[in-house]
Amino acid sequence: MFALCDVNSFYASCETVFRPDLRGRPVVVLSNNDGCVIARSTEAKQLGIAMGEPYFKQKERFQQFGVVCFSSNYELYADMSNRVMTTLEEMSPRVEIYSIDEAFCDLTGIRSCRDLTDFGREIRATVLKRTHLTVGVGIAQTKTLAKLANHAAKKWQRQTGGVVDLSNIDRQRRLLALVPVEDVWGVGRRISKKLNALGIRTALDLSEQSTWIIRKHFNVVLERTVRELRGEPCLELEEFAPAKQEIVCSRSFGERVADYEYMRQAICSYAARAAEKLRGEHQYCRFISTLVKTSPFAMNEPYYGNNAAVKLLTPTQDSRDIINAAVKCLDKIWRDGYRYQKAGVMLGDFFSQGVAQLNLFDDSAPRAGSEKLMEVLDQLNAKDGKGTLYFAGQGIPQQWAMKREMLSPRYTTRFSDLLVVR
């Protein structure tokens, strides 16, 4: 038995938690460089504001209706997510963190001693008490059904109280008959068009299809979905995320970059961030790549995009080695006379241990005390905030930095941003 817990309008809700004056007002959160809408409060949805709407096109409309806009505050969202997940892990024996705002909980054994709907309400109340965030809880025998139950809990929140238990077969069939097939987890727009052409329009229709026919005309993934809709568990709980195969840190610039020095600072910053993520995965890498590109949509400007890579002889997780390699790659592909829109650094070819055959002629041979130094660097930045310690190559006035003109304070991670109660 699974429970899917999903925070309602997560990014927008994180902003209103610390701004009670915004409750009841439409709130939207914008993407990188304040580009387009990526999160909306319930009030913003009621105004018809769609996901992905460009901010510059809707700015006057937002002002007309009193819409409050925020730049993406990823540091705040990550910390609030961690608080939610920690609460869920205390209440459930096993938890799979599926995304920043949702997680699957294993309810095996709980049904024998607790009413599942009551337990779902307890989850909602506990998360609300600790974080002031509201979650929807969908309970069912499979992950796919739990997704549908969660969808119903959020869509009909007033009637359900934000908790839907689909362990009852009759209730399952009633809900499946109401859900369009394109809203089923794992069924995309392209597949739904094919299903509609076959007369399969609802989740109930899909659940009643022959698994053999579905596998023949589609694939084994959709067959698993059919079985899951019937209550046959095909997807297990994944408590530990699989090891990453690559790490990418890339950004679009707040302003176009035409100066090599500014680009080098950006590449140093992205390489340092990628190295920090690499150490967070307890991995070492050998492959390091740098990319740069101009905007393909810029009027009367030539397009240029390129990348270069190096492969180290000895795996590393030292930021200094990764920054050095990334800058060497930049030097290979940099061209004067262009206004660059985006750059990034990618790491690959991972090793779980920094052990490999050493080479006498390796310029990136392991540095003495490297692991200890990187450990101290990460600890200080985790304790006092990202960017407390940084490399000189990253620069101080970062004119290329991502534009975030409506950024809220990092209330939970920066002492300087703590709320003052008067």
Task: Describe the role of every protein-language-model region.
Residues 103-109, 307-313, 356-362:
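Short, hydrophobic beta-strand segments
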Residues 98-102, 140-143, 283-287, 338-342:
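Short Gly/Ser/Thr- and Asp/Glu-enriched loop/turn motifs at secondary-structure junctions
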Residues 112-114, 299, 352-358:
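Short, charged/polar, Gly/Pro-enriched secondary-structure boundary elements
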Residues 327-383, 387:
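C-terminal hydrophobic structural anchor segments
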Residues 10, 33-36, 295-298, 350-354:
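Short, charged/polar surface micro-motifs in flexible loops or helix N-caps
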Residues 183, 191-339, 355:
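DNA-contacting surface of Y-family translesion DNA polymerases
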Residues 1-227, 236-237, 367-422:
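Gly/Gly-Pro- and Ser/Thr-rich, intrinsically disordered tail segments characteristic of DNA damage-repair
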